[in-house]
């Protein structure tokens, strides 16, 4: 019998110390990695529940194990809620991650060797959109599109590549693109060559849910997302669709299970259900609106300080700082900002002369700081501190001054109050 009174710090002090230190880091450092956010205590309560003990291969009402009545309720809540969030008529909440959701879509609709047309990782796409290092670039013939000199998707070039290569699937979505995407234009391009349009909205799902960013649901054959990032849930994936044929839905269902996964993570699915309920609250829309306001305030401030933002600004939650031609690399900037308790990630920018391990750019995002309660004035202060560090990345006095300012700001806006 397990005791309910045993504590991790007593049983495993080494691990408990690491967890406590990470909790402290999250409170004391400002988080600007665009793909990170903080989930609520309610989400964490569900994810830490006894549902982790239950195996439930299959889907609600059609399990291969007994004793699934209550986890069926949890999964059906998640399905029903995410359909409501995105106005979808199909949803699968079992993918363990966004990458696995993407893999499921590819394997459900394509054959090895088929051609896909996706956004280049070097221009803002994602590994799973056909990068050579990823299975999507190994199993399939991946053709890549990018951005023009203004940092914008060149739809004429996408059309040209589609006409030339006749892909079976066009992939739209990004991990580092700060403007709105014309989903209707992408669908027209896909239709012109008889291809599926697959949208990966992992980064912008929360913005889409709140009506702050255009929804791809009316245009894509199938859509995937992570459930963290702007959606502010546990780490995981989903597949959704609107107007999908019964045949397409069956393909998606069967490829997730039994195709690429076995038992679903019922504790994570329960946590997803909580996050989806939160996404239906009026406060969620207000939050997403503020995410964009904060991002625009930061971008405009950095531009005023002489830093180039790829595409000239942002219409979503993120921005790419282009430092080509500057002495400081993305890697060095990330390290310097880290010393000042500002957490970012180095990122390649279009036509980057440096290696992917060094880069000439930084990706900044505002979902996490907005969860803390930051508004535009706080974001402007933060952007100025970032510029101070980038102007003098090896000046210990500057780093110390910014670190003190960040610490004071974080204390004003605790993650978990």
UniProtKB/Swiss-Prot annotation:
Function of the protein: Catalyzes the reversible interconversion of serine and glycine with tetrahydrofolate (THF) serving as the one-carbon carrier. This reaction serves as the major source of one-carbon groups required for the biosynthesis of purines, thymidylate, methionine, and other important biomolecules. Also exhibits THF-independent aldolase activity toward beta-hydroxyamino acids, producing glycine and aldehydes, via a retro-aldol mechanism.
GO process terms (BP): glycine biosynthetic process from serine; tetrahydrofolate interconversion
Binding site for (6S)-5,6,7,8-tetrahydrofolate: 121, 125-127, 355-357
Site (Plays an important role in substrate specificity): 228
Subunit structure and binding partners: Homodimer.
Reactions catalysed according to its record: (6R)-5,10-methylene-5,6,7,8-tetrahydrofolate + glycine + H2O = (6S)-5,6,7,8-tetrahydrofolate + L-serine
UniProt-annotated location(s): Cytoplasm
Biological or metabolic pathway of the protein: One-carbon metabolism; tetrahydrofolate interconversion; Amino-acid biosynthesis; glycine biosynthesis; glycine from L-serine: step 1/1
Main subcellular location of this protein, as a coarse class: cytoplasm
Family per record: Belongs to the SHMT family.
InterPro entries (alphabetical): PyrdxlP-dep_Trfase, PyrdxlP-dep_Trfase_major, PyrdxlP-dep_Trfase_small, Ser_HO-MeTrfase, Ser_HO-MeTrfase-like, Ser_HO-MeTrfase_PLP_BS, SHMT-like_dom
Protein name according to UniProt: Serine hydroxymethyltransferase
GO molecular-function terms, A-Z: glycine hydroxymethyltransferase activity; pyridoxal phosphate binding
């Amino acid at each position: 019998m397990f005791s309910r009174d045993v504590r991790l710090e007593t049983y495993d002090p080494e691990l408990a110390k690491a967890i406590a230190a990470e909790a402290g880091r999250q409170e004391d450092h400002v988080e600007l990695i665009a793909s990170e956010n903080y989930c609520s205590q309610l989400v964490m309560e569900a994810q830490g529940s006894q549902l982790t003990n239950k195996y439930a291969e299959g889907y609600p009402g059609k399990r291969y194990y007994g004793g699934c009545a209550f986890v069926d309720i949890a999964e059906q809540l998640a399905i029903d809620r995410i359909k409501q969030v995105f106005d979808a008529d199909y949803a699968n909440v079992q993918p363990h991650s966004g990458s696995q959701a993407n893999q499921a879509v590819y394997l459900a609709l394509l054959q090895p060797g088929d051609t896909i047309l996706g956004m280049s990782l070097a221009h803002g796409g994602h590994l799973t959109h056909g990068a050579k290092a990823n299975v999507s670039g190994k199993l399939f013939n991946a053709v890549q599109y990018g951005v023009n000199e203004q940092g914008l998707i060149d739809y004429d070039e996408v059309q040209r590549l589609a006409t030339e290569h006749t892909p079976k699937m066009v992939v739209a979505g990004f991990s580092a693109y700060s403007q709105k995407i014309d989903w209707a234009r992408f669908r027209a391009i896909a239709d012109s060559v008889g291809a599926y349009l697959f949208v990966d909205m992992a980064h912008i799902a929360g913005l889409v849910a709140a009506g702050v960013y255009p929804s791809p649901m009316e245009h894509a054959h199938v859509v995937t997302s992570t459930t963290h990032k702007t959606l502010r849930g546990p780490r995981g994936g989903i597949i959704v669709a609107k107007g999908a044929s019964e045949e397409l839905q069956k393909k998606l269902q069967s490829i997730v299970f039994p195709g690429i996964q076995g038992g679903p993570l019922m504790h994570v699915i329960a946590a997803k259900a909580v996050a989806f309920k939160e996404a239906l609250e009026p406060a969620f829309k207000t939050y997403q609106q503020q995410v964009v306001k904060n991002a625009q305030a930061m971008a405009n401030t950095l531009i005023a300080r002489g830093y180039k933002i790829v595409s000239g600004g942002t219409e979503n939650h993120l921005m790419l700082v282009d430092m080509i031609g500057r002495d400081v690399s993305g890697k060095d900037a990330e390290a310097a900002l880290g010393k000042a308790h500002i957490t970012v990630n180095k990122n390649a920018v279009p036509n980057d002369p440096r290696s992917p391990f060094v880069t000439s750019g930084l990706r900044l995002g505002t979902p996490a700081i907005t969860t803390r309660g930051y508004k535009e004035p706080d974001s402007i202060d933060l952007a100025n501190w970032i510029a101070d560090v980038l102007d003098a990345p090896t000046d210990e006095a500057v780093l110390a001054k910014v670190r003190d300012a960040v610490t004071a700001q974080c204390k004003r806006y605790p993650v978990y109050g």
